[in-house]
Regions:
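Beta1/beta-strand and adjacent pyrophosphate-binding region of the FAD-binding site
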Residues: 2-14, 34
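A structural signal for isolated positions on well-ordered beta-strands in alpha/beta enzyme cores
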Residues: 9, 32-34, 81, 210
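N-terminal Rossmann-fold NAD(P) dinucleotide-binding loop
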Residues: 17-18
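Glycine-rich FAD pyrophosphate-binding loop
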Residues: 11, 23-50
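Conserved FAD-binding catalytic core of PHBH/FMO-like flavoproteins
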Residues: 147-237
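Conserved N-terminal helical subregion
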Residues: 65, 74-160, 166-172
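N-terminal FAD cofactor-binding segment of flavoenzymes
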Residues: 46-85
Length: 237
């Protein structure tokens, strides 16, 4: 992309950048908005991409519904059980208590990504000044804008030398676990000395759940080396 001027430039074509572009265009269809996207133009390569579960609040669903960007498949959370390892007591939150359709939702990353791309293409038809630019590492050369939104998950090569992060000494294992006699639409969250452990609903039915297990990098690396039986034993301990 050569030198150009925009009201808003959004850097990053993932779910955050796509949603930001769609909402801005919905409210200001005549605005000069540019989306810089490192993903391919065609959706084909994205269909088999990241299938990890992403937890979204019910408020996020309401917002995404306004731009017709909610995936056709999701796993709803109706109850959340919260506890702390080694401590007595628990907290139980329900959708009935809060008078909500759901407390949250689990969607696959690829599903929300593809749905947002489709929604943005529809909005693009009535937005004459919108530029959706699929870029390479060496582009764009120069852009002027009133506002720049950084929605890029990674770093550009030109940013590698900049101290732009902080090491919190945390990592997480993300995957699926098979369970028995699970209550449908229930999520569990347990706080441990190393960080939170969450077990969440999935698209695959009540017996297959999403797992997010936070811990130190050393602990996470060790858990990755365990056999399935050893991993489950550690998870249940």
């Amino acid at each position: 992309m050569s030198s150009t001027y925009s009201d808003i430039v959004i850097q990053g074509g993932g779910p955050v950048g796509l949603a930001c572009a769609a909402w801005c265009l919905q409210k200001y269809p005549e605005a000069k908005i540019a989306l810089l996207d490192r993903n391919p133009v065609d959706d084909t390569d994205l269909v088999a991409a990241d299938s990890r579960g992403v937890a979204l609040s019910h408020g996020s669903k309401i917002l995404l519904d306004t731009i017709d960007a909610w995936p056709s498949e999701c796993a709803d959370i109706h109850r959340v059980h919260v506890s702390q390892a080694g401590r007595f007591g628990r907290a139980l939150m329900t959708r009935e208590e809060l008078n909500q359709d759901a407390l949250g939702h689990i969607v696959r990353y690829r599903d929300i990504h593809l749905t947002l791309r489709k929604a943005l293409r529809a909005i693009q038809k009535t937005s004459p000044h919108f530029i959706w630019q699929h870029i390479k590492d060496d582009a764009p050369a120069h852009i002027d804008a009133k506002c720049i939104v950084h929605a890029e998950g990674g770093l550009f090569k030109t940013q590698d030398w900049v101290e732009s992060g902080r090491d919190y000494g945390q990592s997480a294992l993300v995957g699926l676990v098979e369970v028995e006699n699970a209550t449908p639409h229930q999520a569990w969250e347990r706080f441990t000395a190393e960080g939170p452990l969450a077990v969440l609903p999935s698209h695959y039915g009540p017996q297959i759940l999403n797992l997010v297990w936070c811990g130190s990098p050393e602990s996470s690396s060790h858990r990755l080396q365990l056999s399935d039986a050893e991993f489950l034993s550690s998870l249940q301990s």
